[in-house]
């Protein structure tokens, strides 16, 4: 595998083969797959990301490992918020929206307390890492 799309494809295949479980960097972490359409291209994509469950909401963090830009999936979800996620063996129709303000800060702090790499991602970048919630339809 040579690029991020190849890497994602490998993680997606492993996720589906193992009922939502993957190894490598994601081993033991809660992972979901985001289906998203390219904001410009319209091309359908699938991205594996760590999530936090909060009631009926699934929350994801557009950290991109602390890079100075948001991941493509974030821009795609803002442009096309009605989508699907895969959690384990289940595919769920959801609507995506950004969480802001104190609620965003609370949720990001919770994720960072569970997975300290998220605190490191926040230290590495000048941007405020977006938190996106998926609410089942």
At which residue positions do the language-model features occur?
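N-terminal short leaders/motifs
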Residues: 1-9, 36-40, 82-91
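Extreme N-terminal tail/first-helix region
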Residues: 1-30
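Short beta-strand segments
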Residues: 29-63
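Short beta-strand element of the conserved SAM-dependent methyltransferase core
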Residues: 34, 132-136
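Short, structured beta-strand-loop surface elements
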Residues: 63-118, 124-128, 136-137
């Amino acid at each position: 595998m040579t690029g991020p799309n190849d890497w994602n494809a490998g993680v997606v295949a492993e996720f589906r083969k193992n009922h939502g479980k993957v190894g490598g960097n994601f081993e033991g972490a809660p992972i979901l797959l985001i289906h998203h359409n390219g904001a410009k291209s319209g091309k359908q994509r699938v991205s594996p990301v760590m999530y936090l469950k909060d009631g009926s909401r699934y929350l994801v963090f557009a950290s991109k490992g602390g890079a100075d830009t948001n991941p493509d999936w974030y821009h795609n979800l803002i442009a096309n918020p009605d989508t699907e996620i895969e959690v384990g063996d289940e595919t769920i129709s959801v609507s995506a929206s950004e969480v802001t303000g104190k609620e965003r800060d609370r949720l990001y702090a919770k994720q960072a307390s569970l997975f300290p790499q998220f605190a490191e991602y926040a230290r590495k970048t000048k941007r405020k890492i977006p938190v996106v919630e998926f609410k089942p339809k």
